[in-house]
Swiss-Prot record:
Tissue: Expressed by the venom gland.
Lineage: Eukaryota, Metazoa, Chordata, Craniata, Vertebrata
Something else known: The putative mature sequence has been predicted by AMPA, a predictive algorithm for identification of peptide stretches with antimicrobial properties.
Keyword rRNA-binding on entry: no
Protein name (database record): Cathelicidin-related peptide Pt_CRAMP1
Species whose genome carries this gene: Pseudonaja textilis
């Protein structure tokens, strides 16, 4: 009987010293992390339309109990719903020509409170530029009967136009970086 008392006392003391949980946050599954990243983008990006998950690439080892940094990669697409409507994402269909964003998120669980840093940038712009360049080359071939100086003049302005357009697009299409803390 006396041995049972000391064993029980030892177990109670071990729990009191160690605590019931050594994690500073509740476990976060991969699906919850992706949902949190999408809702963070919708809430902090300043976009008029809501974005919904298009694809998520699960990492080989997502540990919901980890205190170290965790990375996730996802693709989101613009929907027909506006942010101001405050509708559920399940009710929102994708826009046919909606913007597609490639996002990388980093969860820093070692911080108190935990931190999410989300970086998103537009996808698919290179295809549009290549299509425009092909159309311009076709126009140039059709205009081969023009005098030489007209051709040079047009070629110069086409290069100038491409350069200006490229710089403007690069300036306005910088990746969006969002950093937030979230309580658990």
């Amino acid at each position: 009987m006396e041995g049972f008392f000391w064993k029980t006392w030892l177990v109670v003391a071990a729990f009191a010293i160690g605590g019931t949980s050594s994690l500073p946050h509740k476990p976060l599954t991969y699906e919850e992390a992706v949902d949190l990243a999408v809702s963070t983008y919708n809430g902090k990006s300043g976009e008029e339309s809501l974005y919904r998950l298009l694809e998520a690439v699960p990492p080989p080892k997502w540990d919901p109990l980890s205190e170290s940094n965790q990375e996730l990669n996802l693709t989101i697409k613009e929907t027909v719903c506006l942010v101001a409507e405050e509708r559920s994402l399940e009710e929102c269909d994708f826009q046919d020509d909606g913007a597609v964003m490639g996002c990388t998120g980093y969860f820093f669980f070692g911080e108190s409170p935990p931190v999410l840093v989300l970086t998103c940038e537009p996808l698919g712009e290179d295809e549009e530029q290549n299509q425009e360049e092909e159309e311009e080359e076709e126009k140039e071939e059709d205009e081969k009967d023009q005098p030489r100086r007209v051709k040079r003049f047009k070629k110069f302005f086409m290069k100038l136009k491409k350069s200006v357009k490229k710089r403007v697009m690069k300036f306005f299409k910088k990746p969006m970086v969002i950093g937030v803390t979230f309580p658990f």
